[in-house]
């Protein structure tokens, strides 16, 4: 087990370093360093989703064709079922097909068609990342094609399936949902440290969150039963508190011989951090929980509480205390 954990950590570090180096190699003369995240984070999300959807791509396209033929208006549920995921893409493109596409404006048009083919939940994440605003700049600087090529590099595997050689032996191990979530969180941490003028607004140190989780759960540890619990963060940022608190509650319940199911809920006013939080949950395979995260510039918890009628079993939060209350919309 210890050896496997070491392998997992080595794999995660290798992938994180690889993606980090893409930013330095491709974006150095195109963006100021503090803006690398605007491209790299959504591209990491795209590559993982693309890899996850690869196995069911044909089934989704067939289902889409059938639904259109029968003039079915509400297609989301059926397409999710065909994909076997909480998301899907109905465009004819994959990143691999885009890699073989022509350069320049043709690649731009094909790439936009690919993005527009994603399910509404992924579209929202990309919109909150303002990713479409980056595309023309990437095309004009002749970087878009190289980025696609880099993220498809055969020496790195962002897929949940292993890469095998011609003899069927595993060349690169699979990257499970927890692994890609850890990679994504590591990239976020590095970007926050690299551009730390506002890092505190987006990131609470993990050891602090772990202490907060203990203060939240330990006083009621003996009362935790094998049941379903809800956990809420009204200023959830990138979702780190929810994730750590969820892990802590599972661990505590296990220590007492209990098995719990946990539903996460959160609200976040910053577009980018909301996008990161939702993307992180999708990458971890927690699509249902991602639906419980709401946010955006018009979603202040103070003036536009999205869970006004809900009650929760636990709440954990670290709101931006330096923000004047009257500046909240």
Report residues per predicted region:
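Glycine-rich nucleotide phosphate-binding loop and flanking beta-alpha elements
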Residues: 47, 322-323
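Conserved small/polar residues in nucleotide/adenosyl-binding loops
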Residues: 326-329
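Conserved S-adenosyl-L-methionine
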Residues: 202-317, 322
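Non-catalytic, mostly N-terminal accessory regions of nucleic-acid modification and defense proteins
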Residues: 1-220, 289-301, 306
